[in-house]
């Protein structure tokens, strides 16, 4: 399984629509960088957020998630409260090839500010926006800049196609648009 370079990522994005919209250059002046890099693609966070709140004093339960646990926010800058958590989504829509697994890692710019980004792997033949988990580990409010970089995606091509892809097993987050809350089937 090999890590894929910029030329492969560009070809798959342009010819097969693997990443839409696709930014062929790495944009970094005055913003948290995003776009194509040497061995990855820096994704952007959209201007849609769901910020966790304890107004209703509910327990967070992944099997029975209560939408009252989050507050919707739309804007150019999202303030994540101290020691709190938010969900967001990518600007980009992904179509992952059958023989590819993508791993996402947080950007150093945010990590150095105590902002931890988590995204689960993009499985073979996954299609959709990516829901991003953002943790503010600091005792201070933290800014997240919409339409700027938030994490980097690394693409790994398998030596052979998998027997069962995310699409084949009808993954519960397949074709997700917007921010998707936890689901149990």
From Swiss-Prot:
Its EC number is 3.5.4.13. It holds the Pfam family DCD. SUPFAM superfamilies: dUTPase-like. DCTP binds at residues 107-112, 152, 166, 176. The active site is at residue 133. It comes from the Bacteria. Disulfide bonds: none annotated. InterPro entries: dCTP_deaminase, dUTPase-like_sf, dUTPase_trimeric. Pathway: Pyrimidine metabolism; dUMP biosynthesis; dUMP from dCTP (dUTP route): step 1/2. GO terms for biological process: dUMP biosynthetic process; dUTP biosynthetic process; nucleobase-containing small molecule interconversion. GO terms for molecular function: dCTP deaminase activity; nucleotide binding. Keywords: Hydrolase, Nucleotide metabolism, Nucleotide-binding. Gene3D superfamilies: 2.70.40.10. It catalyses: dCTP + H2O + H(+) = dUTP + NH4(+). It is an enzyme of class 3 (hydrolase). Catalyzes the deamination of dCTP to dUTP. Belongs to the dCTP deaminase family. Homotrimer. NCBIfam families: dCTP_deam. PANTHER family: DCTP DEAMINASE. This is dCTP deaminase. It comes from Nitratiruptor sp. (strain SB155-2). The lineage of its organism: Bacteria, Pseudomonadati, Campylobacterota, Epsilonproteobacteria, Nautiliales. The gene is dcd.
């Amino acid at each position: 399984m090999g890590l894929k370079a910029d030329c492969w990522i560009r070809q798959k994005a342009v010819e097969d629509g693997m990443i839409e919209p696709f930014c062929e250059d790495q944009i970094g002046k005055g913003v948290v960088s995003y776009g194509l890099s040497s061995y990855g693609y820096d994704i952007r966070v959209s201007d849609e957020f769901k910020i966790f709140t304890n107004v209703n004093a509910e327990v967070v339960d992944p099997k029975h998630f209560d939408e009252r646990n989050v507050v919707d926010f739309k804007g150019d800058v999202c303030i994540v409260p101290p020691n709190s958590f938010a969900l967001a989504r990518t600007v980009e829509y992904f179509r992952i090839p059958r023989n590819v697994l993508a791993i996402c890692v947080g950007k150093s710019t945010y990590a150095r500010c105590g902002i931890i980004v988590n995204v689960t792997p993009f499985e073979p033949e996954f299609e959709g926006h990516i829901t991003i988990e953002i943790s503010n580990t600091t005792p201070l409010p933290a800014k997240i800049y919409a339409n700027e970089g938030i994490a980097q995606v690394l693409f790994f091509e398998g030596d052979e196609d998998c027997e069962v892809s995310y699409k084949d097993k009808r993954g519960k987050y397949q074709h997700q648009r917007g921010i998707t809350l936890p689901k149990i089937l």
